[in-house]
């Protein structure tokens, strides 16, 4: 299903052949994910948001985040949300992408996930896309949280965190 969805989107799917459930966050799996990411030399990595009701989402987020921390190369790292309020919790975006022109393509790709009722997933995502679009001034948008290695103060932090003269 995932590879069929990738075909619809015109992207190359890369799977690590993990079981559907019960993957541990351990040194072996972190090394495997880190090696795979390093081998691809990506510009960005997009991973699940770790505060999620679904255990597989939390696991994949933890593995990707550990790989990001362990990486010897630098790449952009973003978290995405999955059905905010139902699965992803406490998600406060730092970045948005207007998906208005590709929403139909995303819908088609979700329909490939027959075992997960892709149409029902689409209906939940469509509400989320419209809400996120409203937040950023687009008809539909996806939201992301960007992690930054540069140790800079991010917009929105309280003023007390900016001052170093305490």
Give residue ranges: language-model regions.
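Generic hydrophobic, amphipathic alpha-helix propensity
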Residues: 1-2
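Metal-dependent de-N-acetylase/amidase catalytic core
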Residues: 7, 11-14, 18-166
């Amino acid at each position: 299903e995932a590879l069929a969805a990738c075909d619809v989107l015109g992207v190359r799917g890369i799977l690590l052949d993990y079981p559907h459930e019960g993957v541990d966050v351990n040194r072996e799996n972190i090394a495997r994910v880190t090696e795979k990411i390093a081998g691809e030399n990506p510009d960005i990595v997009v991973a699940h948001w770790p505060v999620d009701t679904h255990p597989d989402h939390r696991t994949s987020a933890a593995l990707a985040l550990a790989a990001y921390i362990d990486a010897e190369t630098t790449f952009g790292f973003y978290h995405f949300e999955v059905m905010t309020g139902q699965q992803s919790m406490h998600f406060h975006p730092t970045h948005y992408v207007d998906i208005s022109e590709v929403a139909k393509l995303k819908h088609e790709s979700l329909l490939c996930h027959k075992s997960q009722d892709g149409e029902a997933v689409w209906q939940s995502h469509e509400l989320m896309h419209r809400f996120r679009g409203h937040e950023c001034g687009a008809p539909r948008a996806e939201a992301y949280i960007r992690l930054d290695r540069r140790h800079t103060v991010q917009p929105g932090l309280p003023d007390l965190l900016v001052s170093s003269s305490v």
